[in-house]
Regions:
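Conserved N-terminal entry element of GNAT/NAT acetyltransferase domains
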Residues: 1-11, 152-161
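A short helix-loop-beta-strand connector motif used in the catalytic cores of GNAT acetyltransferases and
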Residues: 45-56, 77
């Protein structure tokens, strides 16, 4: 198996959109997409990839994951982190998270849908803590979400006793 992480190129747009759409539909069905598949594909091609900050995880030539980051005035943001469903649990999400940590200044923030319990456990296991819960009025899906922030470098995830 050949694994590489690299900056997304416009040639990756269809594959990146496929990862996003499959992951959202199969793993986050509790937060239905606010846009059509074609609109998502256009957004990836015209906005997400050209904005920079998007990394793809590629296994044997197949895009299986994506990470999109941005830099705010007082924090770094993980805008998107998605894997094809069959690649969850293989360590790729953790590797993408480490790429974000290497690129972004602290603190690092991200939003996650409250109903996406698997992703919430993943982020919490990797040192993120919930700092605000909302009713979803501020997101396109109108689905309750939670704002996470990376724990300080001195903090470590709690292990069960």
């Amino acid at each position: 198996m050949r694994l590489e992480f690299r900056a997304a190129a416009l040639d990756d747009a269809d594959s990146v959109a496929e990862v996003y759409l499959r992951s959202r539909k199969e793993l986050v069905a509790c937060a239905p997409l606010a846009h059509s598949d074609d609109d998502v594909r256009g957004w990836v091609r015209r906005r997400l990839i050209p904005a920079g900050g998007t990394t793809v995880a590629v296994v044997d030539g197949l895009v299986v994951g994506l990470l999109a980051i941005s830099r705010g005035q007082d924090c770094g943001w993980i805008e998107q982190l998605y894997l094809l469903p069959g690649w969850i649990g293989c360590g790729l999400g953790a590797q993408l998270l480490e790429i974000a940590r290497g690129e972004l200044a602290s603190p690092i923030r991200l939003y996650c849908f409250q109903c996406n319990e698997r992703a919430r456990r993943f982020y919490e296991r990797h040192g993120f803590r919930a700092i605000r819960f909302s009713d979803g009025a501020g997101n396109e899906e109108k689905c309750p979400d939670v704002l996470y922030e990376a724990a300080s470098p001195s903090a470590s995830p709690r292990r069960p006793a």
